[in-house]
């Protein structure tokens, strides 16, 4: 990893120090995923927890989509599409093409490999496992064995924008409508009742 403006000796001292400390990285969006990837391998993985943003999570086609959490998982496991900065590398699009052919929504670019992740997440949640447990399992399936990747809360937190076209979740506004409707207000539904992830408290 490269850290502009930080000399090698200074970085070495920092890494040496962090090897003896517990570290929590707050990761949201593509920048958070790149941060997690940059520090992966430098910090003591067993003593590092990456806390991901659940505010962009939403339901789509019956699946729970966790964009920020998945971006971290893909980035750390080197499975992310580096050119786009999101999604899986070597992706295919057969399912999306068929959904569109059958008249379903095609605005969200979900590739076949990405959909496989969402299906496994849904299976785990439907079996009664927590979001943190399901995320940990997905991390292991991607080859991440010691670094903890944990959604910030088990309770749903949804970013909802009230616009001139009505209420839209963040992805519908940002991706589906390309930020076109005028935003009147922003609400974080569920935030007031959400509690920190148990794994964070125990960490």
Feature locations, PLM:
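Structural beta-sheet core signal
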Residues: 25, 50-51
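Short glycine/serine/threonine-rich phosphate/pyrophosphate-binding segments
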Residues: 31-36
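Electropositive, gly/pro-rich neighborhoods at or near active sites that engage anionic ligands
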Residues: 53-194
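Glycine-rich Rossmann-fold phosphate-binding loop(s) that bind the pyrophosphate
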Residues: 28
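A generic structural motif
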Residues: 43-49
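Extreme N-terminal starter segment of soluble prokaryotic enzymes
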Residues: 18-23
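A short, well-structured juxtamembrane/interface segment
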Residues: 195-203
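Short, Lys/Arg-enriched N-terminal segments with co-localized hydrophobic residues
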Residues: 2-17
